[in-house]
């Protein structure tokens, strides 16, 4: 049995991260989505425990101080974090966990004890103009929020060099195909296959018997 992967997807808002995360899970339904904890209020249609674990600030900070968060960050006035228990359990059982997080969270995970099992991918927009167009077209935020997201976008983009792979999302289907290829190949890394050492020992024993 292989070890599970921590698959990190990061991008500035509007670069297609959430859409590609959904497509990746549609492709392989065994990939688990890391359900983050957040102090922000639930939006219409969101369900506690599905999109997020909605908690108050005191409960969130308590989890952080007790070592219960794999990563956490303060974004747009709210706290976000990934509870560590479910992630560790999934990795040990050979299940992949998908993270839709910013560069701060990605950095914390890649510097954690689970770094050997981490795959980090950054999504770049084809242009800043296209990034703004996508934010405006999705009609999810008001003008002030879009302006804040655009202000933050370059800070996010500036950390592209710390990721394992970087994809320019100028065509969603092409980017999806590249993403699947990367995940498939990374699952075959030697570090993800703990049974290989024992297999080679068996090969050595067989070789010695037949020699």
UniProtKB/Swiss-Prot annotation:
Residues 4-184 form the Guanylate kinase-like domain. It catalyses: GMP + ATP = GDP + ADP. Its EC number is 2.7.4.8. Essential for recycling GMP and indirectly, cGMP. Belongs to the guanylate kinase family. Keywords: ATP-binding, Cytoplasm, Kinase, Nucleotide-binding, Transferase. The keyword Acyltransferase does not apply. It is found in: Cytoplasm. It comes from Roseobacter denitrificans (strain ATCC 33942 / OCh 114) (Erythrobacter sp. (strain OCh 114)). PROSITE patterns: GUANYLATE_KINASE_1 (PS00856), GUANYLATE_KINASE_2 (PS50052). GO terms for molecular function: ATP binding; guanylate kinase activity. ATP binds at residues 11-18. This is Guanylate kinase.
């Amino acid at each position: 049995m292989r070890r599970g992967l921590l698959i990190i997807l990061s991008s500035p808002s509007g670069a297609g991260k959430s859409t590609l995360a959904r497509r990746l899970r549609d492709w392989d339904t065994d990939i688990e989505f890391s359900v983050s904890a957040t102090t922000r209020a639930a939006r219409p249609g969101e369900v506690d425990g599905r999109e997020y674990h909605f908690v108050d600030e005191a409960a969130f900070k308590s989890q952080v101080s007790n070592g219960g968060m794999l990563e956490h960050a303060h974004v747009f006035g709210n706290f976000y974090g990934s509870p560590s228990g479910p992630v560790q359990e999934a990795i040990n059982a050979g299940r992949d966990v998908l993270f839709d997080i910013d560069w701060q969270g990605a950095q914390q995970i890649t510097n954690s004890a689970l770094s050997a099992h981490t795959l980090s991918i950054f999504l770049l927009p084809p242009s800043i103009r296209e990034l703004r167009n996508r934010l405006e077209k999705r009609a999810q935020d008001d003008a002030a929020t879009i302006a804040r997201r655009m202000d933050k976008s370059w800070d996010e983009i500036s950390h592209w060099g710390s990721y394992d792979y970087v994809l320019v999302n100028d065509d969603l289907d092409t980017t999806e195909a590249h993403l699947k290829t990367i995940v498939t190949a990374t699952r075959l890394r030697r570090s993800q296959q703990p049974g290989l050492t024992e297999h080679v020992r068996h090969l050595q024993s067989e070789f010695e018997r037949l020699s």
